[in-house]
C-alpha cells in the first residue's frame, strides 16, 4: 500500500518542493512536512484508503446530479455528535450525500464567533463529544453515502489556543506564529490599506495584549489572532491538523476566510499571490495522502476574483467554492422583482473555466452581505447605495409592502452599510403570513421559498440546504433573552431544530410537508441527465426582467428552467431557443410565448 503513496508523492514532489522552498526557503521545514505526510498516510485506515482509491478512479464524484447537501450546527440539531448519529434515518430520508457540520473543534465558551475561534484544531469540543464520536459518525455517514464536511479555520486561532497562551507567556517560538508588534508604528501603516471586517463590533485590525505588551493582528474579533503563514512551522502544523481530521473520516474541508491568510504591508491583505501558493500546496498534500478528501473555499469576493481560487486544470487549488454572489443576487432579485443583476452575475460565473464548481445555497450560519456588483448596477441605472439600503430594509421588514421578517447585522450609519439575518422561510414571508393568518399571503410565501430553492438546485454545482429550510423553520427570536447570544443578530437564524414541526413533514397539506415535497421534487429534477458533470449551463433572454431562464444541455438533451420572480402572472419569450418542448406533465410548451403563474418555476424538456 505504501507504493500508492510513493507513486502519488512522486507526481507532486517537484512542484511541492519548489513552491515550499520558493515561499519559505526552509529545507528543514520541508523535510518535516514530508515526514508528516508519510506518517499520516501510514496512520490512515484501510477503509479510508479504499475510499481514496475509489475517488481517484471517479474524480467527478462531487459533480454528479445526485449531490444534495445540508448544513447545520450539531448542538442545535441534535445536542451532540452521538445524538446526531441517531438522526441518520432523517438524512437518508432526504437522500443527502453531503453534510456540513458547523465548527465543532474545541473552542472557548461562551464567546467563540460561532465556533470560528478554535482552541485546538485536533480535538472535538467536549460539549459536542469526542474524537471517537466524530470518527464513529463519519463511518456511519460513509456507509450511508454521505460525505462529512467540516470547517477548517485557516486564518486565525482563538486567543486561548495553546500557541497563543505560550506566546503570551513569552515563548519566542510561538510568538512567531502570530503577527506581533511592540508599538503602533507598523500597525498604523497596515491600517492605512487594510479594510475593517467588523468596523462597529470589532473596530480596527489590531488588539493590545497586556501579557506580552504587544499589538496582535486580529482581522476579525479581538479574541481571534491571525496566524503568520510567513512562518513555515505554521503551515506545517496546520497541514498536520487537516491530515489528522481527514484520518478521522472528514471528506470535505471548508477552508474559512482563505483570501485573508497572507499579510503584506502596503496591501489590503486580501487575495495575495502567496495565498494561492499555500492552497496549491495543501491541495497537493491531500492528493498525496488522502485523495478522497476535497477542499471547499470560502471566498466572499467578486466573481472576477473567484477563478484564481480554483487554480488551473493543470495546477488546481480548491475543488469548489461557496457561491456567495449568486446567493446575494437571488435575494436581491426576489425583493426587486428584477432578475437583470442575477442574470449578469450568472453570465460571469458561466464564463469561468470548466474546472470551476460551486456549492449553491440560500441561507447558512452567516448573514447576507449585500456585496452586489456596483458596475453592473450602474449599467442598469441602479443606484448601488440606495439599492443596498432598500434590500436590507426590505428584509428587515421595515420597508412598506415587505413580506419579510428579519434583522440587520452590523449596521453602520456612517457608511449606510448593513447585512441581513433570518431564515429562508421568514425572509420569504412565511412568518408574517402565519402571524396575520392570511392564507393567500402564506401561499405566496411558500411559492417564493420554493422558487428560490428551484433556481438554486438548477445552477451549476450542487445545492446545500440550511437545516430547517426543508420544513420551513422560522426565526428564533428567543435568542434575545440569552445574554450570551443576544448581541449577535445572526443567532436569529441559529435556533434549535424544530423536531415537532418536522413530524408534520409527511402530513399532506401541512406547511412542513409543502417544503419537504418541494425538496423531493428538486432531487427528482437533478436525476435528469442534463445534470451530468460536463453539462453546459447558461442563461437565456426572456424579454422580461422579472423572469429568469436557465438552460442545461447534455448531448442531445436540453432542460429549460423558467423562474418568475414576481407576484404577478408573467410572460416570457425564448424565441431564439429552437426545438419542441414539454412540461413535466407532458403538455407541449411553446417557448416563444410562455405564461407563468406568480412565483412559478416551470421546467420543460426537449422532445
Would you name each region that the model predicts?
Residues 1-576, 585-607:
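Active-site and adjacent substrate-binding regions of carbohydrate-active enzymes
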Amino acid at each position: 500500500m505504501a507504493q500508492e503513496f510513493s507513486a502519488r508523492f512522486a507526481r507532486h514532489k517537484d512542484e511541492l518542493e519548489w513552491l515550499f522552498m520558493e515561499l519559505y526557503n526552509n529545507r528543514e521545514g520541508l523535510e518535516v512536512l514530508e515526514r508528516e505526510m508519510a506518517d499520516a498516510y501510514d496512520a490512515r485506515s484501510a477503509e479510508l484508503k479504499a475510499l481514496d482509491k475509489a475517488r481517484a478512479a471517479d474524480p467527478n464524484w462531487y459533480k454528479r446530479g445526485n449531490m444534495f447537501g445540508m448544513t447545520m450546527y450539531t448542538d442545535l440539531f441534535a445536542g451532540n455528535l452521538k445524538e446526531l448519529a441517531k438522526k441518520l434515518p432523517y438524512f437518508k430520508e432526504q437522500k443527502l450525500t453531503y453534510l456540513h457540520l458547523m465548527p465543532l473543534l474545541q473552542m472557548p465558551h461562551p464567546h467563540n464567533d460561532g465556533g470560528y475561534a478554535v482552541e485546538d484544531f485536533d480535538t472535538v469540543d467536549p460539549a459536542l463529544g469526542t474524537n471517537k464520536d466524530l470518527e464513529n459518525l463519519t463511518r456511519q455517514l460513509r456507509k450511508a453515502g454521505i460525505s462529512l464536511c467540516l470547517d477548517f479555520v485557516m486564518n486565525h486561532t482563538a486567543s486561548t489556543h495553546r500557541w497563543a497562551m505560550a506566546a503570551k507567556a513569552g515563548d519566542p517560538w510561538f510568538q512567531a506564529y502570530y503577527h506581533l508588534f511592540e508599538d503602533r508604528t507598523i500597525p498604523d501603516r497596515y491600517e492605512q490599506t487594510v479594510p475593517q471586517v467588523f468596523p462597529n463590533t470589532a473596530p480596527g485590525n489590531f488588539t493590545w495584549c497586556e501579557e506580552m505588551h504587544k499589538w496582535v493582528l486580529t482581522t476579525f474579533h479581538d479574541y481571534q489572532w491571525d496566524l503568520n503563514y510567513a512562518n513555515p512551522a505554521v503551515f506545517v502544523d496546520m497541514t498536520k491538523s487537516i491530515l489528522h481530521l481527514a484520518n478521522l473520516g472528514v471528506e470535505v474541508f471548508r477552508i474559512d476566510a482563505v483570501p485573508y491568510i497572507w499579510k503584506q504591508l502596503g496591501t489590503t491583505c486580501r487575495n495575495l499571490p502567496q495565498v494561492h501558493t499555500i492552497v496549491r500546496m495543501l491541495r497537493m498534500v491531500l492528493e498525496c495522502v488522502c485523495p478522497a478528501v476535497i477542499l471547499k473555499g470560502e471566498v466572499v469576493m467578486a466573481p472576477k476574483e473567484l477563478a484564481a481560487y480554483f487554480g488551473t486544470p493543470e495546477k488546481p487549488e480548491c475543488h469548489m467554492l461557496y457561491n456567495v454572489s449568486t446567493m446575494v443576487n437571488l435575494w436581491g432579485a426576489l425583493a426587486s422583482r428584477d432578475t437583470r443583476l442575477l442574470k449578469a452575475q450568472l453570465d460571469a460565473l458561466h464564463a469561468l473555466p470548466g474546472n470551476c464548481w460551486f456549492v449553491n445555497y440560500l441561507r447558512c450560519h452567516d448573514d447576507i452581505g449585500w456585496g452586489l456588483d456596483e458596475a453592473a448596477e450602474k449599467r442598469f441605472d441602479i443606484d448601488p447605495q440606495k439599492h443596498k439600503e432598500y434590500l436590507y430594509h426590505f428584509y428587515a421588514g421595515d420597508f412598506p409592502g415587505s413580506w419579510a421578517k428579519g434583522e440587520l447585522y452590523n449596521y453602520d450609519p456612517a457608511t449606510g452599510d448593513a447585512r441581513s439575518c433570518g431564515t429562508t422561510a421568514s425572509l420569504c414571508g412565511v412568518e408574517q403570513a402565519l402571524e396575520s393568518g392570511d392564507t393567500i399571503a402564506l401561499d405566496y410565501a411558500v411559492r417564493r421559498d420554493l422558487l428560490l430553492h428551484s433556481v438554486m438546485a438548477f445552477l451549476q454545482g450542487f445545492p446545500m440546504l440550511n437545516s430547517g429550510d426543508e420544513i420551513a423553520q422560522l426565526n428564533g427570536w428567543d435568542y434575545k433573552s440569552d445574554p450570551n447570544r443576544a448581541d449577535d443578530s445572526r443567532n436569529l437564524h441559529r435556533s434549535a431544530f424544530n423536531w415537532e414541526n418536522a413530524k408534520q413533514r409527511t402530513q399532506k397539506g401541512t406547511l412542513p410537508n409543502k417544503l419537504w415535497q418541494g425538496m423531493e421534487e428538486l432531487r427528482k429534477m437533478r436525476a435528469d441527465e442534463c445534470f451530468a458533470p460536463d453539462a453546459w449551463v447558461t442563461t437565456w433572454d426572456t424579454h422580461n426582467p422579472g423572469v429568469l431562464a436557465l438552460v442545461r444541455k447534455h448531448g442531445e438533451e436540453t432542460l429549460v428552467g423558467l423562474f418568475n420572480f414576481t407576484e404577478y402572472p408573467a410572460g416570457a419569450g425564448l424565441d431564439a431557443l429552437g426545438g419542441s418542448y414539454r412540461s413535466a406533465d407532458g403538455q407541449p410548451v411553446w417557448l416563444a410565448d410562455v405564461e407563468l403563474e406568480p412565483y412559478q418555476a416551470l421546467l420543460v424538456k426537449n422532445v
